[in-house]
Amino acid sequence: MGSGRGCETTAVPLLMAVAVAGGTAGHLYPGEVCPGMDIRNNLTRLHELENCSVIEGHLQILLMFKTRPEDFRDLSFPKLIMITDYLLLFRVYGLESLKDLFPNLTVIRGSRLFFNYALVIFEMVHLKELGLYNLMNITRGSVRIEKNNELCYLATIDWSRILDYVEDNYIVLNKDDNEECGDVCPGTAKGKTNCPATVINGQFVERCWTHSHCQKVCPTICKSHGCTAEGLCCHKECLGNCSEPDDPTKCVACRNFYLDGQCVETCPPPYYHFQDWRCVNFSFCQDLHYKCRNSRKPGCHQYVIHNNKCIPECPSGYTMNSSNLMCTPCLGPCPKVCQILEGEKTIDSVTSAQELRGCTVINGSLIINIRGGNNLAAELEANLGLIEEISGFLKIRRSYALVSLSFFRKLHLIRGETLEIGNYSFYALDNQNLRQLWDWNKHNLTITQGKLFFHYNPKLCLSEIHKMEEVSGTKGRQERNDIALKTNGDQASCENELLKFSFIRTSFDKILLRWEPYWPPDFRDLLGFMLFYKEAPYQNVTEFDGQDACGSNSWTVVDIDPPQRSNDPKSQTPSHPGWLMRGLKPWTQYAIFVKTLVTFSDERRTYGAKSDIIYVQTDATNPSVPLDPISVSNSSSQIILKWKPPSDPNGNITHYLVYWERQAEDSELFELDYCLKGLKLPSRTWSPPFESDDSQKHNQSEYDDSASECCSCPKTDSQILKELEESSFRKTFEDYLHNVVFVPRKTSSGNGAEDTRPSRKRRSLEEVGNVTATTPTLPDFPNISSTIAPTSHEEHRPFEKVVNKESLVISGLRHFTGYRIELQACNQDSPEERSGVAAYVSARTMPEAKADDIVGPVTHEIFENNVVHLMWQEPKEPNGLIVLYEVSYRRYGDEELHLCVSRKHFALERGCRLRGLSPGNYSVRVRATSLAGNGSWTEPTYFYVTDYLDVPSNIAKIIIGPLIFVFLFSVVIGSIYLFLRKRQPDGPMGPLYASSNPEYLSASDVFPSSVYVPDEWEVPREKITLLRELGQGSFGMVYEGNAKDIIKGEVETRVAVKTVNESASLRERIEFLNEASVMKGFTCHHVVRLLGVVSKGQPTLVVMELMAHGDLKSHLRSLRPDAENNPGRPPPTLQEMIQMTAEIADGMAYLNAKKFVHRDLAARNCMVAHDFTVKIGDFGMTRDIYETDYYRKGGKGLLPVRWMSPESLKDGVFTASSDMWSFGVVLWEITSLAEQPYQGLSNEQVLKFVMDGGYLDPPDNCPERLTDLMRMCWQFNPKMRPTFLEIVNLLKDDLHPSFPEVSFFYSEENKAPESEELEMEFEDMENVPLDRSSHCQREEAGCREGGSSLSIKRTYDEHIPYTHMNGGKKNGRVLTLPRSNPS
């Protein structure tokens, strides 16, 4: 089934200006204009969409019963942008979403509609989401989404942003209707959605297509033109979307017409409008014209040019100029030649007459067969009144409604180039009410060749016929039997012989009849037979039933030619005449009779023959779909199913087949943490009770002993009428759908073509009571054990039952579980069983009252540091599945506290841990929450938490003694170590601690033997609340949390909280706090800020400023257009890159002013705040994530060689100048969106390349200004590189107005240094130690070496070890830095 346009079905190339959603803005790619497609039965033809950008016609994908989800996983057609007619999906199994199939479908124009709809999704049994996240406009028509049992994400779509009018949308009987969908828009699981929200029916709701794709909502002022990713309005000629604002060449689709890569309001010369959406040239239209003229296929039009349009034919009043295909106005009456493709055109209704409206010349023959109609004469004159000439013959046959032929008011010529059998050019037969031909006083008619034929026109006078002979010039051409003298104008007839049927055979839609031959004395008088038949439920039909003077006739009449007969009576072997009746209704009784059609003459009377009326019934066939299936659950193990018989039983319905199969819960429910704030808890409801009176009686009589239910109020007449209209409309749509999509299968030619009709293997009939309840399916979490074994799909086997009535109680089901039920009607219990198309319905059993209760007591285990581990057993067979647990605990005398435990967290710990409990008596209880709601609370469990400092004095003595001895021993060992260290200074081969993410000098080296002392930075523990994990840091887990009163003027602040692992040693805990002490000295807006320390109690916490967008490297990569986690923002502009550069330079200038050298400046170690400010520092998470950015040289420590300067790689020199080299690489990362530097080179090759004087090439399309900055940073001579203050000075004029208010560059702290300090800064920068407490060492080194270049390098190599600001030496590596070659 194609597009229905004949020769228009050839795909033509098209270069469309389309911006690929999620791709590079403004990207142009080639595509094709493809014809409409009907893809059914299998996926073979689906690949024809591979290169289509536009489907000029409709797209139907339907009736695929053997496809599976994996068949669609690798299928994607990203080039498809627009469908000009409609999109229909119907019964495609295995298809779960359209997001991968049509990721860039943006516009459905609706030029031709499917039953008034442009988008139809009907009975898609596995579809879970639409996923058309780039669909922006449905130009004409509405949306119909119906009977999709798994379809969600419908309530989250704002159709008013896609269609102009949503009142005619029909979206019913989907899973979304039952509120069973846990629709989660992107970002909701993290507590903040990224999707726009709009108001529908008074509800302000986020809009999205799937859990990972928001609905794009443009500003209202953009109307339907669409907008860019930044929300800027497209050009007025755009439709749906664009890549750049106000540019007609950057549209995804065009509002009016498309021409040469841009959208235009109208097609300029020499182009013409075509199909209401594109411009074509004359050659294109000419090719269509000649192609169709030569092919003469039905429905193929010979296109012409008119009013700047390439259209199928000229309108009325115009004729085609064959030289240029133009439609030119006629001079006077306009000849409009209408070609009859089949040679003959039968006019049997007003509709068929309208097809000839405006025609003046008929190239072919006309057959008029009108039996009835309203205002028929006026309608025929309006449509046929302009016909002046007929090239063939005119036949008026059995037109009971005609009284005159005057509606042919301009007909003046019948050429007779094609004649009816017997050489007739005018043929009038059996017109019961025809009284007049024309008013011959006013009408002239010429018949060029051929004869006249008049028979069985009882009300047409012979004088009228003879007048026509004279006027038309045919007098003398007729033979004796051409004009019957006794059947024209005379109703008498004689039929006295009985015809008998000799053979009858039936099928479900055909009847084959044969009867005994009949020949009059002169066999030439037999014109043929007339077969009459009609539906007859009862055997009481007479011949004249349903006929009246107005031409109404309830009989269907078929003209049958007489059998062939030889003129030699001796050799005649007459065969039995017969007829095959087609297109009948199955299992229907028909009344049939046959009579002869013979001629009458004035010389003799010929007697005819007629049969008796017989009754024949067609055979049975497959019944239609059972109507109105309703499913309800009356208990936790039963579902009641009711339905109505099919509208077309097509036989005696003997029984019904019912199949049911348990459905697995949505896999997304296992992955989401429903304890997060803002995440909607999924809900499932069982099937509601019946509402109709019949259903209530049905329930009470068979399944419910109580009759105390309240009655519902009777419905009003308007409600009943509305329900009837909706039911009728729904049935009409389904009939239309089935008539369109179910077409006869082509007969197989023996080539073994696969029959893809839905088939079902016979299942063993089992007792319903023996159905085994299976356990719910659990996802495979890594490293998680569970007491509930996962259930595979094989265990959800289907069951079948044969039912002899229109209801069934399905028992033995699992509580609160969804079931998919199929229902088929069957007739004739025979070996070749006939079962019809299945109806589908979904139902869910009621919840079990105690199924969600936790069995057994809640146990506990108390650990040190006042940590209590609570443990309990999962409910063995919950209602659906458990989504979370609620823990309620309280200390005696305090208020009750509640803790939410997610399913995933419970699986990890088989319970949960309560931390930071104060000493005292506690009670705790737990309850589970399933898809059905909350279970019951467990019985309270009691435990006592002691004060870990409250220990007996004798135990204290036992512990304190050894501690004193260990302390004294440590002091002695430490003294020896320091003495040896002073005598053995570290040289170039000395040890250096390097972490996989080194940044700052650690306070552990500043105060190696100190113990942290609480100060004004101390924060009470109760003011810190942990919300969620951010990742693993150097010492332990890093959390996002809330801190109260930690910043002056803010009641509550979102912070990052670093912790120490429980297994950490005392030294590691001290180092952790000492590292926090280092951060206390940083008070720069562009350096991550310390907010407080919690050192009292366990665990130790360090509270830092929260950087909401993570590290700069991840942030830049997320801005790539093809990134899966793209937040919907475009890549940074030049202005934004300059702002980032200045913020990093300002933070580094501050650190240098504090005499700190970074040594690992990279995008991974810069953090991005909520307002996209970039700051120096991280939360200790990049060590595991980016360890591949480091290189272990010579078996020693890890070094970030791709960011290191030549002198650092060669001599181990780390200075402010080497930081400047790294700063240049950071610039390169910003402009390349965090690509890997020196891609294609190994770490060893990078070492050699940089030490030999090489550096990075600027990225493609890099702004020249940033390229110049990079090259300044990559000067081989360190002294030639700029300082960070100079970088800020170069960029200060292009920065945000807020920069002077917050930056170090403009602060009072950045005062000009004294001359001697300035001199030291430039000359002795390499001597700046990593320990800011070692100023005396700096002075001593400067005096000893005299400031020469060689001395500086040698002195630098004597720097002391250092560690990362977020980690101690445990994550460092001791390595020997390489010596420079003596040469």
Swiss-Prot record:
Residues 625-727, 754-848, 854-948 form the Fibronectin type-III domain. Residues 771-783 have a biased composition (Polar residues). The lineage of its organism: Eukaryota, Metazoa, Chordata, Craniata, Vertebrata. Residues 1-26 form the signal peptide. The record marks F65 as: Insulin-binding. Residues 687-709, 747-783, 1361-1383 are annotated as: Disordered. It is a single-pass type I membrane protein. Residues 27-759, 764-957 are extracellular. Keywords: ATP-binding, Carbohydrate metabolism, Cell membrane, Cleavage on pair of basic residues, Disulfide bond, Endosome, Glycoprotein, Isopeptide bond, Kinase, Lysosome, Membrane, Nucleotide-binding, Phosphoprotein, Receptor, Repeat, S-nitrosylation, Signal, Transferase, Transmembrane, Transmembrane helix, Tyrosine-protein kinase, Ubl conjugation. Residues 1362-1365 are annotated as: PIK3R1 binding. The chain crosses the membrane at residues 958-978. Residues 734-742 are annotated as: Insulin-binding. The modification Phosphotyrosine is found at Y400, Y1000, Y1186, Y1190, Y1191, Y1356, Y1362. The active site is at D1160. Belongs to the protein kinase superfamily. Tyr protein kinase family. Insulin receptor subfamily. The modification S-nitrosocysteine is found at C1084. One of its GO terms (biological process) is insulin receptor signaling pathway. This is Insulin receptor. ATP binds at S1034, K1058, E1105, L1106, M1107, A1108, H1109, G1110, D1111, R1164, N1165, D1178. Disulfide bonds join C34-C52, C152-C181, C185-C208, C195-C214, C218-C227, C222-C233, C234-C242, C238-C251, C254-C263, C267-C279, C285-C310, C292-C300, C314-C327, C330-C334, C338-C359, C461-C494, C675-C900. Residues 997-1000 are annotated as: Important for interaction with IRS1, SHC1 and STAT5B. It is found in: Cell membrane; Late endosome; Lysosome.
